[in-house]
Every structure is written in C-alpha cells, then in structure tokens.
From Swiss-Prot:
Transmembrane segments: none annotated. GO terms for biological process: protein folding. Residues 1-25 are annotated as: Disordered. It comes from Azotobacter vinelandii (strain DJ / ATCC BAA-1303). Participates actively in the response to hyperosmotic and heat shock by preventing the aggregation of stress-denatured proteins, in association with DnaK and GrpE. It is the nucleotide exchange factor for DnaK and may function as a thermosensor. Unfolded proteins bind initially to DnaJ; upon interaction with the DnaJ-bound protein, DnaK hydrolyzes its bound ATP, resulting in the formation of a stable complex. GrpE releases ADP from DnaK; ATP binding to DnaK triggers the release of the substrate protein, thus completing the reaction cycle. Homodimer. It is found in: Cytoplasm. One of its GO terms (cellular component) is cytosol. This is Protein GrpE.
Length: 187
C-alpha cells in the first residue's frame, strides 16, 4: 500500500510536469507559427513596396516617352519650315540690295529656329565632305569625283536631324564614287 501511495503521489507530480512540457511545446509551436506569419507578412510588405516603386518608375518612363514622342512629331512638322527658310536664303541673291532686309530677317528667324531646336536637343546633320554613314544619311545619287574620297558626301539636298541622339530625319545626300577610267587611260 505504501508503494501504491508513492505511485499515486508520483503520478500527480509527473502529470503537471508533462502538462507543463506539453504547454511549453505548444507555446514554442505557437511562437514558431507566429514568427513564420511575421516573416511572410514582412516579405509581402517588401514585395508590395518594390512593386509600388516599379509602378512609379514605369509611370515616369511612360510620361517621359509621351513627351519625347509628342516633341518628335512637333519637331518633324517644324523641319519643313526650317528647310523652307534655308532654301529661301540659299536662293536669294546677297548682292541684291532691294531684298537685303528681307534676307537678313530670314537669317535672324532661321538662327532663332536653330537656337530653339538646340534647346530641345535637336541636332542638325550637315554631312558635307564627311564619309557616308547609312545610319544618318540617305543616298539619293552617286557622282564621280576626282576631288573627293570615294564614299564621301559631295552634296546635301536636305539636312538631317537627331533628336536626343536618335535619328529624326536622315540627311539626303549625293555620295562620291571613284571616276571610271577613260578610254585614253586604259590604253
């Protein structure tokens, strides 16, 4: 009986200890689960912040592209006006006193146009004498030339333009080629 009482005494003592261990394990499991939930929530918050930053960056790029494309169309429309002013100055006689004030006015207007175009990163391509570059020039014809290197630009029909380093309009040019030997030179 004494042994039974000892066993009875031990059993109640072991039971709370076992319950304490079980409660401790439950608590540790609960803490572990909460830590995992916290890590998942932090990861979601970090991803959401990164996504928001990406959306902002894309929106800024879209606005910048819209401005560039709007500027590109507007600049292309203005190039015809610049071309006309240049042709008018080119065709007017600088020695003719009767049109001198008009010519000077056209030259000033053209200078102002060029200043405005530069302000908006529009760069004029005048490749006279330069080697032909198919990325910036459009060959309209080829001419034989003794004085120019073969493959260089002899004449410029229409100047080209770059907008922010990107080709807006190629320069229309005549390219030199080596002269063909005459019958006298072949003999």
């Amino acid at each position: 009986m004494a042994d039974e009482q000892n066993l009875d005494n031990r059993a109640p003592e072991e039971t709370p200890a076992a319950e304490g261990t079980s409660a401790g394990e439950d608590l540790a499991a609960r803490v572990q689960a909460l830590e995992e939930q916290l890590a998942a929530a932090q990861d979601q918050a970090l991803r959401a912040a990164a996504e928001l930053q990406n959306v902002r960056r894309r929106a800024e790029q879209d606005v910048e592209k819209a401005h560039k494309f709007a500027l590109e169309r507007f600049a292309q429309d203005l190039l015809g006006v610049v071309d006309s002013l240049e042709r008018g100055i080119e065709l007017s006689d600088p020695a003719d006193e009767s049109i001198r004030p008009m010519r000077e006015g056209m030259e000033l207007t053209l200078k102002m146009f060029h200043d405005v175009l530069r302000r908006y990163q529009l760069e004029q391509l005048d490749p006279h004498g330069e080697p032909f570059n198919p990325e910036h020039h459009q060959a309209m014809a080829m001419e034989e030339s003794d004085s120019a290197e073969p493959g260089s630009v002899l004449k410029v029909f229409q100047k080209g333009y770059l907008l922010s380093g990107r080709l807006l309009r190629p320069a229309m040019v005549v390219v030199s080629k080596a002269p063909t030997p005459s019958n006298d030179e072949q003999a």
